[in-house]
Amino acid sequence: MMLRELNDTQIEDLLKNQLIGRIGCHSDGITYVVPVNYIYDGLNIYCHSGKGMKINLMRKNPEVCFEVDEIKEITNWQSVIAWGQFEEITAIDEKQQVMQKLINRIMPHIVDDSVPPSHGFVDEEGDTVELIIYKIVITRKTGRFEKR
């Protein structure tokens, strides 16, 4: 077994082809890693969220990392880590475009078609919670793999 580096094409392919990645953020002595749906356009990673710990931490410290992987078995996997800056998207038209791209990317993978993708979250009282749309502007990325 030997770890090897992914080349640029392999890194791009993994980022473009996966649906779920993990964002790592840190502020005020708290490190938080959470899975997210995302899209990647070759430059930036786009995600959505409701308010909460992840958004609070990224607003305080916009330096984040993003991890995505494909694990076929314990000795056959690949992983990419990207570092970058959290930027909240506030322009309505850009938010709508990103959300539509996210929906288009995710819809083919939804097994239960009775549950449509939402354009917002609903809290415990049934009230709609505003979606926060953001991007990670990638500054660096690297990838590794193992294949026996």
Give the role of each language-model region.
Residues M1-N17:
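Extreme N-terminal tail/first-helix region
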Residues E12, N37, N56, K72, ...:
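Short secondary-structure boundary/capping segments
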Residues Q18-G50, F66-E67:
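Short beta-strand segments
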Residues S27, E70, V137-R140:
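Short, structured patches in soluble enzyme cores that scaffold and shape functional sites
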Residues S49-G52, P62-D69, V115-F121:
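Short acidic (Asp/Glu) patches
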Residues K54-N61, C65-W83, E87:
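Helix-adjacent hinge/juxtasegments
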Residues Q78-R148:
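Charged, gly/pro-rich active-site loop segments
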